[in-house]
Amino acid sequence: MLCQRLLRVFIFVIVAASLAAARDLAVVSNKSNAVGAITVGDLVKVCKAQTNRWPDGKLVTFVMRSPSSPEMKMVLEKVYGMSESELNSLIVTSNHARASHPAILVATSDEELVNKVASTPGAVGVVDVYSINSSVAVIKIGGKLPLEPGYLLHGN
């Protein structure tokens, strides 16, 4: 009886953890940015700080959650194609020459991420779709919006 109860609790915890990790994410932008859509290749360049300026001349800043956060697991796999430690090194290297306007900012919460994107001209970020508010604009990836079939950052 005790073994069955422990097994049920264990299965519940595993299922709950996998559902929590399968979040739908979205790319959001500062409203002053002229970018409404981005290709997957261009998104990778922005995330890796390989794109310094938008077509209108504004400096690009990418805002993200900590590479160790569960939210970033999918982004590490689908966008960066690198490990957490490699991404941490990339953040340090990318920001070294851009102290006044960092290439990559790390936020401690989705709320902080949205606020940083909203208040930083040229900023874009990746955030849980349920944290989006009217202070930021949603950017299409590969012609698709979040929750549309085939969207790159769909959680499942």
Where are these regions (language model features)?
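Absolute protein N-terminus
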Residues: 1, 22-23
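Bacterial N-terminal signal peptides that target proteins for export
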Residues: 1-10
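Short, charged beta->alpha transition segments
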Residues: 12-13, 50
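Residue-level detector of alpha-helix boundary/anchor positions
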Residues: 14-15, 119
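Sec/Tat signal peptide C-region and signal peptidase I cleavage site
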Residues: 15-22
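Exported/periplasmic ABC-transporter solute-binding proteins
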Residues: 23-156
